[in-house]
């Protein structure tokens, strides 16, 4: 289910790249450029932190969804997709975090 939801959202965001900014929130963000998108990602990340401190699971889920959505817009701005992140996560699956970190510091 998760992949299909992310794929559908990704498809919509990608379509909004060519939409009229006066008719779409996503098109507005993409039209305004990277700095505006980054400000929104920072704002949403802060809201995730606050929701975590609130100890309210449903509020945390809501805010993480906002953060994911806005990072997907950022990815689209860079002609990347959520699938690229999922591929990276799949690559890391089964790797020890400590081993992976050590490999990064050696190179």
UniProtKB/Swiss-Prot annotation:
Record's protein name: Phosphoribosyl-ATP pyrophosphatase
Q: Name one Pfam family in it.
A: PRA-PH
Its source organism is Neisseria meningitidis serogroup B (strain ATCC BAA-335 / MC58)
GO annotation, biological process:
L-histidine biosynthetic process
State which pathway it belongs to: Amino-acid biosynthesis; L-histidine biosynthesis; L-histidine from 5-phospho-alpha-D-ribose 1-diphosphate: step 2/9
The protein's matches in CDD domains, at most eight in alphabetical order, are given as: NTP-PPase_HisIE_like
State a single Gene Ontology molecular function: ATP binding
Write out the annotated subcellular location.
Cytoplasm
Q: Mainly localized where?
A: cytoplasm
- Return the similarity comment: Belongs to the PRA-PH family.
Catalyzed reactions? 1-(5-phospho-beta-D-ribosyl)-ATP + H2O = 1-(5-phospho-beta-D-ribosyl)-5'-AMP + diphosphate + H(+)
Q: What lineage is on file?
A: Bacteria, Pseudomonadati, Pseudomonadota, Betaproteobacteria, Neisseriales
What are the entry keywords? Amino-acid biosynthesis, ATP-binding, Cytoplasm, Histidine biosynthesis, Hydrolase, Nucleotide-binding
Q: Which InterPro entries match?
A: HisE, PRib-ATP_PPHydrolase-like
Where are the coiled-coil regions? none
Q: Which residues cross the membrane?
A: none
Enzyme Commission designation: 3.6.1.31
Q: Which PANTHER family match?
A: HISTIDINE BIOSYNTHESIS BIFUNCTIONAL PROTEIN, HISTIDINE BIOSYNTHESIS BIFUNCTIONAL PROTEIN HISIE
Query: According to its record, what are the GO cellular component terms?
Result: cytoplasm
């Amino acid at each position: 289910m998760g992949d299909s939801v992310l794929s559908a959202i990704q498809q919509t965001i990608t379509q909004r790249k060519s939409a009229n900014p006066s008719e779409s929130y996503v098109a507005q963000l993409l039209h305004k450029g990277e700095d505006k998108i980054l400000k929104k990602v920072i704002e949403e990340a802060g809201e995730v932190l606050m929701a975590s401190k609130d100890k309210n699971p449903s509020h945390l889920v809501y805010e993480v969804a906002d953060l994911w959505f806005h990072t997907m817009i950022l990815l689209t701005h860079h002609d990347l997709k959520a699938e690229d992140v999922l591929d990276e996560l799949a690559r890391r699956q089964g790797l020890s975090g400590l081993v992976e970190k050590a490999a990064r510091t050696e190179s």
